[in-house]
Amino acid sequence: MSQSFEGELKTLLRSGKVILGTRKTLKLLKTGKVKGVVVSSTLRQDLKDDIMTFSKFSDIPIYLYKGSGYELGTLCGKPFMVSVIGIVDEGESKILEFIKEVKQ
């Protein structure tokens, strides 16, 4: 994969559709409307466990971002913390391929 996660995330935010936030992402994850999930390293463990459990049932890839929620928020161009990003439509990005490649 030639581009970094940050580059793919910026392409995703520009051309795709995402949901920011744990509650909204969990809700869509339970209904199978999310294609992938990005989780920051600072997300509470109980919430991270919930996301991992639901994603395994639906075979939805998860990327564990090594930075904090504040760093992920900054990457998203937000002035606040973003702990979870739900990918609804990847647009022109290849972020789902990137996530699957990293998992292998």
Swiss-Prot record:
Protein family per UniProt: Belongs to the eukaryotic ribosomal protein eL30 family.
Keyword annotations of the record: Ribonucleoprotein, Ribosomal protein
NCBIfam families documented for this protein: PRK01018.1 (NF002172)
Organism of derivation: Sulfolobus acidocaldarius (strain ATCC 33909 / DSM 639 / JCM 8929 / NBRC 15157 / NCIMB 11770)
GO biological process per UniProt: translation
PROSITE patterns with a match to the protein in the record: RIBOSOMAL_L30E_1 (PS00709), RIBOSOMAL_L30E_2 (PS00993)
A Pfam family per the record: Ribosomal_L7Ae
Any GO MF annotation of the entry: structural constituent of ribosome
Keyword Ribonucleoprotein belongs to the record: yes
Domain of life: Archaea
CC annotations in GO: cytosolic large ribosomal subunit
PANTHER family: RIBOSOMAL PROTEIN L30 (PTHR11449)
Keyword Ribosomal protein: yes
Protein name: Large ribosomal subunit protein eL30
